[in-house]
Amino acid sequence: TFYASIDHVHADAMFMVALFVEIYQNYSALGEGGAPIKLPDPGRYLDYCTRQREYTSALTLESPVVVEWLDFLRRNGGTLPTFPLPLGGSDIPCTGDLITVKLMDSHDSDRFEAVCAQSGVRFLGGVFACAAIAERELAGVDTYQVITPTTTRSSPAEFMTTGWFTGIVPISVPVEGMSFNQVARAAQAAFDSGMHLANVPIERVLELAASLPGISKPGPGVPMLSYLDIGLPPLNPVVMGQWQDRNGTLYTDLGAANQIGMWVNRRDTGTTVTVAYPDNAVARESVAQYVDMMKVVFLRAAEGRADSVSSPRIPRATV
């Protein structure tokens, strides 16, 4: 049995997955009497940090990328968005918890991908669309607002380098009165057009905007939605497909989960969502409602029943 214990501050999810692939490939090669796998040369994390520091130090409030981030913040009351359902009082400390739910089996995942392709978007665009429609139906939002992480690795060497090569992309998607296809196209466009903002840490934007009225640091309840298909490069679909067969397991220490982290993952057995949330009764109920609605919307889209967005069922909640 191989164990690896890594502080998430020092290694992003892409590296952790690559680590498992490396262990598996080398173990298989040695077990079959072969030589260790020759790995590509890694880069230096210090070089990446130096490059990023030089770039962000040159930014000003007039820099186009900073202006784009500020526009997103202002659409959310001057800060990052908040989860649309109640999460309980933030004044009472609590630990975090996780829930994982299967959204679609492999057959429905394939059908969902086909629907996305017919709409001119990738699976990722459909994921954001389903979350947007779920929020519309649960909380009456007119525009879906969320942040999503993405890798900032830009070379083969960086994909072999230990470190934190991750930024966030702001997503704003109009949803009122629109069909799944329309929402998906808007979501895909929002992601694609905002990818360059991942290289601009939100902390740097807030630092520059410290003197601006109406701009503030985010509080608890910021939603983050991530999508990962383990069958797509640079991951190894053959190796990752055997993850569960090899009893591969990730153990996490959530600590105080003040935010809402959502990870939609697609593999050969289907599509799941894992949600990290504050471990209290209010947040637990809200997350359960949210995930249940997400599943309904995903299946509805996969079955070709993605008509106009339905009217909201309940008013938007205050976190």
What are these regions (language model features)?
Residues 41-97:
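Short amphipathic alpha-helices and their capping loops
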Residues 9, 22-33, 71-79, 172, ...:
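Phosphate/oxyanion-binding loops and surfaces in catalytic or ligand/nucleic-acid-binding neighborhoods
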Residues 32-42, 144-145, 306-311:
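Short, glycine/acidic-rich hinge or "gate" loops at secondary-structure transitions
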Residues 1-46, 286-300:
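Active-site-proximal acidic secondary-structure segment that organizes catalysis
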Residues 38, 57, 135-203, 213, ...:
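Acyl-thioester-dependent acyl-group transfer interface
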Residues 16-17, 95-111, 253-267, 306-319:
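AMP-binding/adenylate-forming domain of the ANL superfamily
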Residues 1-5, 61, 88-155, 166-167, ...:
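Gly/Ser/Thr-rich phosphate-binding loops and adjoining beta-strand/alpha-helix segments
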